[in-house]
Amino acid sequence: MTSRATANLPLREATDFGDRQFGAALVNVTNICNLSCSHCFVFRADNPNRPKDKMDDATMLAQLRALRDRHGIRSMLFMGGEPMIRKKLVLEAIELFENGSIVTNGTYGIPSVPGHLVTVSLDGPEPLNDAIRGQGVFQKVRESVFARDPGDGTIVMLQMTITKQNAPGIEEFVETVKDWPITGVAFTFYVPSHDEHGTLAWDDLRERDPVVRRVIAMKEKYPRLVKSTVGALEMMFSDRCLQFTGEHGENCLMRNMLP
């Protein structure tokens, strides 16, 4: 929403990233979120709900258009915070790109964006998910998923971020959601801060290898439901994952995206 104070201000120029072409990019449309998930990298670094300068809708849309045209961006990932707090902006912005993706916690409903992807974060069966994301969140997300029109053309994925805390629930999670009106399920692994020790991360990546094997087993059992590929999952094994990321993320493919 544009306030009266900013309505007549000139639009700011988009950041100059040079002449490099980027096929994909991501944008955090807000740092604000209605949840406080224990594994969230935003909450680890800061309080995202603290008032800060916010780019108004008109400026953000103008900058997204400029960056798209300048860098040849075809795919845009909309993140937060919780991006659906700025639903009007996101629904308008996603149509600027050939391929759009929204990552949401699902508590504001599932947006209808035919031809685009909506990834809904859900971190295990109800008790394990709610221990991470907050009491009642699992049921809110379930209600949102079942309230949507499954024939509207929106690609809807559930994504479980696997931690040491919720790893015991992988199989139960898949069995619980396998008949939901979704396109599929994806798995990612929690990325700890440097030298982090606690209940979420494995101190030794070799301890995580049995969990990777369990996810691969779910892929083999439900090949159409679980969208993570076996090849991608095998990259998570301790004897090869650092080859693809580097010790400090220097080899990460995300570096090829415009941030």
Segments from the language model and where they lie:
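Radical SAM enzyme [4Fe-4S]-AdoMet core and its adjacent flexible, acidic
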Residues: 1-6, 116, 121, 127-258
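A short, mixed-charge helix-start or loop-turn motif at secondary-structure junctions
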Residues: 26, 46-49, 126-130, 155
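Conserved alpha-helical substructure of the radical SAM core
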Residues: 1-112
